[in-house]
């Protein structure tokens, strides 16, 4: 478990910032956050305005979705890592930020991500998930490769050839859902269940009310979107039928993994809810947010990087007798660095929330600040992992940043709710899919550059993940 040292010779400073007028200032901050400035600029502007990386903020969505939106934000690498210390930060019902989905989204249960490590159920549930992954590790590569071929690359190439462009983001959900479902459901095809071909759509509908209060879909006029999605929580009834189909499909198909839960003393119904959360938030939403950034950065880097990646990948695979194995993938240092760099620049979950369990002192690079017991706090990870006092050229995509001596900087890669040099365990809050996400990020590059030499993309910025359209694909030279 990460522990945070409060010992410091830095000067003690009052936390700067101003919550402003009740409700009015919070609504203005919300419009700036979602529409006028955007997330990155909003946090940077707060730090610049108050000349501090520990500041008071009104955190979106604010009124009237939440009554508890007056937070303290940690915007540098030093202060941010206190969020990982279980003795200081309580994570109970703070996963989604200042609001929480109703228990009806999980049949009255609270998945492990919503409970703190002090909860007596935490260790059992987290241990169960980690064990389930470990027992299926031999399936990761073959199942993901099949999904990439059947549901992504073949369609990508066909659309580029026939239409001159292919929407990468539109193809991702079917690929990721197929992989996840088969992995956790004894290799059952989701199309053979009550979900049919609509599994990704049912999952997206179930996720939408849980995520949209903290996001901007950019598909409606600002005032309409804000009124509908940031002032009120969407009633569960709108997506109840989608949820019921998901529960039915996983209850009937994930037989082995549910049997494992019962052997550990976990109720089958509770295990289903934890699996559904794992599928929806940890894996489906995470992979669909991360993958566009990966191909955006690699695509914009151009043919030189593509040539280097293709050479490394094909050389290692040839040396391994033509087999794509975990051992082979682990030898690809540039591929590994590219994935780490993407996770550093654009973590799938950019915000970490919690409440102080006790009074403590938090340090930025320049000062110490007192955090009072019960204070709601948030860390904005893209600023922490792009801290200019930690990384050179922090806002640039540097493909080989984590190669050779650069590996020592991995402790500052924080995307998984923990340091990259640490591991998820039953007694911490680090993402249980940490190693799987990194493996899949590498594997998608390996599969891609075994097929293609280079490519070009068209990028459309969205609130967090960009939309990536492939414009050209050059097949691998013999």
Curated annotation (Swiss-Prot):
Tissue localization of expression is: Expressed in roots.
Q: What class of enzyme is it?
A: lyase
Q: What is its EC number?
A: 4.2.1.121
Check the record and name the CDD domains matching this protein: CYP74
- This protein's UniProt keywords: Heme, Iron, Lyase, Metal-binding
Q: Where is heme annotated to bind?
A: 431
* Protein name from the UniProt record: Divinyl ether synthase CYP74D2
What lineage does UniProt assign to this protein's organism?
Eukaryota, Viridiplantae, Streptophyta, Embryophyta, Tracheophyta
Gene name per UniProt: DES
């Amino acid at each position: 478990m990460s522990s945070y040292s409060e010992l410091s010779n830095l000067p003690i400073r009052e936390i700067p910032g101003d919550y402003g007028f009740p409700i009015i200032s919070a609504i203005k901050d919300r419009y700036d956050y979602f529409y006028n400035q955007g997330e990155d600029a909003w946090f940077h502007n707060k730090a610049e305005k108050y000349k501090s990386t520990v500041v008071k903020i009104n955190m979106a969505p604010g009124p009237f979705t939440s009554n508890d939106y007056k937070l303290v934000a940690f915007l540098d690498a030093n202060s941010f890592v206190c969020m990982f210390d279980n003795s200081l930060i309580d994570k109970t019902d703070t996963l989604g930020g200042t609001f929480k989905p109703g228990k009806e989204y999980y049949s009255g249960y609270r998945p492990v991500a919503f409970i703190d490590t002090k909860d007596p159920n935490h260790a059992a549930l987290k241990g169960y998930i980690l064990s389930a992954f470990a027992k299926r590790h031999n399936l990761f590569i073959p199942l993901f490769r099949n999904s990439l071929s059947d549901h992504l690359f073949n369609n990508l190439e066909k659309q580029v050839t026939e239409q001159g462009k292919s929407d990468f983001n539109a193809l991702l959900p079917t690929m990721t859902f197929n992989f996840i479902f088969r992995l956790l459901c004894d290799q059952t095809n989701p199309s053979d269940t009550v979900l049919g071909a609509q599994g990704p759509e049912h999952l997206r509908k179930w996720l939408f009310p849980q995520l949209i209060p903290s996001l901007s879909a950019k598909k409606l006029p600002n005032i309409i979107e804000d009124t509908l999605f940031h002032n009120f929580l969407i009633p569960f009834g709108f997506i109840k039928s989608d949820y019921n189909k998901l529960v039915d499909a996983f209850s009937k198909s994930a037989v082995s993994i549910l049997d494992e839960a019962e052997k550990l003393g976990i109720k089958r119904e509770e295990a289903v809810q934890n699996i559904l959360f794992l599928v929806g938030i940890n894996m489906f939403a995470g992979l669909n947010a991360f993958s566009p950034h990966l191909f955006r950065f690699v695509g914009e880097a151009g043919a030189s990087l593509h040539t280097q990646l293709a050479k490394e990948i094909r050389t290692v695979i040839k040396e391994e007798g033509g087999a794509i194995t975990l051992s082979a993938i682990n030898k690809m240092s540039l591929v590994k660095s590219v994935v780490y760099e993407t996770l550093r620049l654009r973590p799938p979950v950019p915000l970490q929330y919690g409440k102080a369990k006790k009074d403590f002192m938090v340090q930025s690079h320049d000062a110490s600040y007192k955090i009072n017991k019960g204070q709601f706090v948030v860390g904005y990870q893209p600023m922490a992992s792009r801290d200019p006092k930690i990384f050179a050229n922090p806002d640039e995509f540097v493909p080989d940043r984590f190669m050779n001596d650069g590996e020592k900087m991995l402790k500052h890669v924080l995307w998984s709710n923990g340091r990259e040099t640490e591991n998820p365990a039953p007694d911490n809050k680090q993402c249980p899919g940490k190693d799987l996400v990194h493996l899949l990020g590498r594997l998608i590059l390996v599969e891609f550059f075994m097929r293609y030499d280079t490519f070009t993309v068209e990028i459309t910025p969205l609130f967090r993940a960009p939309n990536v359209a492939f414009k050209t694909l050059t097949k691998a030279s013999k």
